[in-house]
Amino acid sequence: MRRITLTGTALAVLLLLLLGGVAIAGATPAATPDKAKTLHLDLQFSPFKLIDVDHDGGPSLGDYVIFHDLLSSRGKQIGDEGGTCPIVDATEGLIHCTGTMRLPGGQIAFQGLTTAAPTKELAVTGGTGRYQGAGGEATLVELGDGTGTLTVRLRR
């Protein structure tokens, strides 16, 4: 496989397409009676790699992105997240992202289909440590400047 480092417009398009990976960290959760927690975090996107499986020079079916981003709360880095997003429909810009957030006290797994829309919804599919048995959803909003916000609603 050939690794391609993207620049310019291609990087911007793929960043919007493929960083549906959400981020969550040890932010102070807001507890509710049904044992739900809501975490509000900031996300700093890091460079990522597009693996061009068919060597055609652009995003196509089966190509994928590997990502690793930083998570912060109140201006302090408190975790990170990483994963992969294979392209499942290049015409529609559809990707299926899976990843894991590494946080103080445990990890949270996520996945889902997403597109280039600046707001992305993904499922929380489990966790370890203090997040063991967690489910829920995460909403990522890309701010267009290499940063984003993340709201994670956890249920047990």
Regions found by a protein language model. Name each.
Residues 1-11:
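Bacterial N-terminal signal peptides that target proteins for export
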Residues 9-21:
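Bacterial N-terminal signal peptides
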Residues 23-26:
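Signal peptide cleavage region of secreted peptide precursors
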Residues 28-156:
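Beta-strand-enriched cores of mature, soluble protein domains
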